Amino acid sequence: MKKILLFPGAFNPPHNGHAEAVETVLRKESFDELWIVPSGKRDDKTIATSYEDRRAMGNLFVEYLQSKINIPVKLITAELNNIDGKFTHEILKEIKSQPDIDVMQLIGSDGFLDLQKGKLIDSQEKFIVMNRNGYELPKNFSLNENRVIFDGTTQSISSTQIRNMVKNHDIGYKKLVPEKITSFIEGNRLYF
């Protein structure tokens, strides 16, 4: 059975904090493949960046990760292509139902808390929850074999912060984003 680390998110844009989260997990856990799953339509966020631009940045992020880690990395664009209104949890269930794969989902504590609130978590789903500043899990959070918490030293970066930095012409964002993605953002005038 192939062991997959599934990493869903907006990735608008992908940044060094995302890469660092993956590297932190892979130092402690082993997987056969990493699947990056950019989200499509969302109830909680408006995503103005086009499908084509997000897919292109996703491909650049896969290339960047592939240079840093020793397992294959795939970009899963099922949700970006989503025209029938399915949301992340529905598409992830379809992915996880594939035979011969064991899927563990990497998610920030903010996303996990949102899923819990919406009662979108099946007790059998496997998660690695990466603590994010400002979104600490409750002290009574129940751990089991399907729930692993990482109190990693990942950078406290958000894609929203990066978009705002670009919009405000703060070149400090270039230290937070892989170089080829920075070039893509500038070349396509994203977030300006």
Label each region the model flagged.
Residues 1-192:
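Nucleotidyltransferase catalytic core that binds NTPs
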